[in-house]
């Protein structure tokens, strides 16, 4: 039997953190070695499995990666951009691989993480669902065939608690389409419309955002021409799809050398 990959999960008490703990419990290739919470949390010492509602896992919540340094090989991080950069810095200093599912990074933060990847293996992906990564491949085909003469819009929806907009997945959709069409997304993106906007510029890629209720994640790319339109949609009904993808990424990453990877490489959709 192949040795299981030992993982640590940051933000263990959050919605996504608890789902990641549950996914680790269910995955035969993964062993939860540590669950990290912020300093001062009242959950210190609580069993991570009990916290996630999946039964005891004999892993107590701790407030420091330093305390867990010998307990894991791959860190899984779905926290905040600022925290993720700090955690990646720690991993680079301690020779630990890291899977980053956080979104909302600015350019400077992405550059920092890229620099750390020269020292350790990193998977960084705005969405780890298998279906979403397949969708990005489909968007390449759609953009090649219809993109030059269609109006392109990206519509995304998430729960009321999501802090960044548009979502990282929506931005990646725009990047895939823009790159396929030879455009610069920073120059052609339009984020929301209001007032008298004038006739639509055919070279633009529009973004619309919904934040409501408990929507886990819905993304649609619209290619609209006169007389027909194509819609490519992905809907997530559970955070578990992201968590399972993160476990798959951690297992794959444990066998890689230093470098910055994405989920499409994990899934074998690109080299």
UniProtKB/Swiss-Prot annotation:
GO terms for biological process: diaminopimelate biosynthetic process; lysine biosynthetic process via diaminopimelate. It is an enzyme of class 1 (oxidoreductase). Keywords: Amino-acid biosynthesis, Cytoplasm, Diaminopimelate biosynthesis, Lysine biosynthesis, NAD, NADP, Oxidoreductase. SUPFAM superfamilies: Glyceraldehyde-3-phosphate dehydrogenase-like, C-terminal domain, NAD(P)-binding Rossmann-fold domains. (S)-2,3,4,5-tetrahydrodipicolinate binds at residues 159, 168-169. The active site is at 158 (proton donor/acceptor), 162 (proton donor). It comes from the Bacteria. Its EC number is 1.17.1.8. NADP(+) binds at residue 38. InterPro entries: DapB_C, DapB_N, DapB_N_CS, DHDPR_bac, NAD(P)-bd_dom_sf. It holds the Pfam family DapB_C. Catalyzes the conversion of 4-hydroxy-tetrahydrodipicolinate (HTPA) to tetrahydrodipicolinate. This is 4-hydroxy-tetrahydrodipicolinate reductase.
